[in-house]
A protein has these predicted regions:
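Short alpha-helical segments and helix-capping/turn motifs at coil-helix boundaries
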Residues: 10, 43-46, 116-117
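Low-complexity intrinsically disordered segments
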Residues: 26, 94-169
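Generic structural motif
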Residues: 50-52, 65, 90-92, 137, ...
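Mature extracytoplasmic domains of secretory-pathway proteins
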Residues: 57-125
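C-terminal segment of classical bacterial N-terminal signal peptides
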Residues: 12-21
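Composition- and surface-driven signal marking solvent-exposed, interaction-prone regions
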Residues: 1, 20, 74-75
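N-terminal secretory signal peptides
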Residues: 24-84
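Bacterial N-terminal signal peptides that target proteins for export
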Residues: 1-8
């Protein structure tokens, strides 16, 4: 039994690929109960904030449903794929390194096995806009549910406006 479990854990690590370079864990902004559950945790909507670790001056807020009940309280529930996303410029934009279109900005597990939420980023070079996409996927199949947010790169104080197209690999 231990061998099977160890194999599954190893396979999950290989399938998920290398972890993105994350500067920090997301900050919980607030939670709001949506379904009351007697004697067990309620179902909730949780709103988090995260700064883009590779592009200074951009922050994203996302809201995810969190299941309550016994399985949710034990961390065993598979969460649904309904995730909303809003990203904004919060300071002068500074690119730390070159990026590829669709690079993972943030990844989080959404179930005990094989389901994860990902925020990926790209650049619309023609419009000089950063584009962020959140979606969830599983080992075998993903969900078509997604949310997109655009961040036009605007002047901030006296700083020069960088062109995101110059930072694509």
């Amino acid at each position: 039994m231990r061998g099977i479990l160890a194999g599954l854990v190893l396979m999950a690590g290989l399938v998920s690929g290398p972890a993105p370079a994350l500067a920090q864990a997301p900050d919980l902004i607030f939670k709001k109960s949506t379904v009351f559950r007697f004697l067990t945790p309620d179902d909730k909507l949780a709103t988090y904030a995260i700064d883009d670790p590779e592009i200074e001056g951009v922050a994203c807020h996302y809201t995810i449903p969190e299941k309550g009940g016994i399985s949710g309280g034990l961390g065993l529930a598979e969460e649904v794929s309904d995730i909303s996303l809003a990203c904004r410029q919060v300071g002068p934009i500074k690119f730390k390194s070159k990026m590829e279109q669709g690079d993972v900005m943030f990844r989080q597990s959404r179930s005990i096995l094989f389901k994860r939420m990902q925020i990926v980023r790209g650049c619309d070079a023609k419009r000089n806009v950063l584009v962020y996409l959140v979606y969830s996927d599983k080992l075998i199949d993903g969900s078509p549910k997604n949310s997109t947010s655009s961040v036009p790169i605007n002047p901030w104080g006296q700083s020069e406006i960088p062109k995101c197209g110059e930072w694509i690999k």
